[in-house]
A protein has these predicted regions:
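N-terminal loops that bind phosphate or other acidic moieties
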Residues: 1-308
Length: 308
């Protein structure tokens, strides 16, 4: 049996490559031939998923985090000349410091500028996992134009107008701060043309700022799977999943896109926790104990190989 192990990350527990390795270990122990192809939807870790699938070279840059502290960040140059830049590499969300009214996306702009200075053929910008809610104002202070074609992998569909109420609380905003963010966003007249653009709310409004510069906002999971050349043909089994399977898993998340593209092939979706079974696909819950996530995935892979 040929199996494709293509999980997304179990956030805060296992990165997607480690989850894929654990699944593949179990599949091989059960006698299957297994290939590892970790997946992502545009958030943190997307560049590494693409590097594993396509190759490429990491580049380093000195930038500033969301609160103007110096940090080193890296971006990925793919073999075809595309620069892959993650917002979370520069201005990551830090649960120990949540201040959405003060956080700036300037550091992400610095990282994008560093990638552009290297002369890439194109940009693939990955949005998600940031501390920022500044509608991309910091980015726009640094990057005035995109000199090459740019695609943006977004892990949400929310618009700029919706972002404060949806994402503000995740980044530490209480009701008063959400109201202030809504006021600030409303005053950004230069963003009026992209205020209601789907995915413009990604990464605290970075999507809208990039759309203003002419970048194309795309569903992250589909974009990443296309770039990684996901193809289930020739496999007898596809195994995917994430930390929590719920009603949103089928709505643009990476495992949902894997399952959709695997129609006609036996597909199993796992969840560290399963709130809602994935429609029409065998759904398996792990133990739910983060400390045992890796061994759970090894055991799942072995069981799937032995029982099919």
């Amino acid at each position: 049996m040929r199996a494709l192990a293509c999980p997304a990350s179990l956030k805060g527990v296992l990165a997607a490559p480690l989850a894929a390795a654990a699944l593949a270990e179990g599949l091989r122990a059960g006698g299957a031939e297994a290939r590892e192809l970790p997946v992502a939807d545009g958030g943190e870790g997307t560049a590494e998923v693409l590097r594993l699938a396509l190759g490429g070279e990491w580049r380093e840059a000195d930038v500033h985090d969301a609160f103007a502290q110096p940090r080193s960040a890296r971006w990925l140059l793919l073999p075809d000349g595309t620069a892959v830049v993650e917002s979370a590499a520069a201005v990551p969300l830090d649960p120990e410091r949540l201040d959405p009214l003060a956080a700036s996306s300037r550091g992400f702009g610095e990282l994008v500028a560093a990638a552009l200075a290297a002369g890439p053929e194109a940009l693939l910008l990955c949005l998600g996992g940031t501390a920022t809610m500044d509608a991309g104002a910091g980015l726009l202070d640094v990057v005035g134009e995109l000199s090459v074609p740019a695609r943006v992998a977004c892990d949400v569909t929310a618009t700029l107008a919706e972002a404060p109420s949806i994402f503000g609380p995740q980044k530490g905003a209480g009701p008063a701060e959400v109201a202030e963010l809504e006021r600030r966003f409303a005053e950004l007249e230069e963003l009026d043309s992209v205020r209601h653009t789907p995915r413009g709310g990604a990464a605290g409004g970075l999507g809208a700022a990039l759309a203003l510069l002419g970048a194309e906002l795309l569903p992250g999971a589909a974009l990443v799977l296309d770039a990684a050349r996901f193809d289930p043909s020739g496999y007898d089994l596809v195994v995917t999943g994430e930390g929590r399977v719920d009603a949103t898993t089928a709505l643009g998340k990476a495992p949902g896109e894997v399952a959709r593209r695997s129609a006609g092939t036996c597909c199993v979706v796992f969840g560290g926790v399963v709130d809602v079974a994935f429609p029409g696909v065998e759904t398996v819950a792990l133990s739910g104990d983060p400390a045992h996530a890796r061994e759970d995935l090894v055991a799942l892979g072995r069981a799937l190989a032995v029982n099919r």
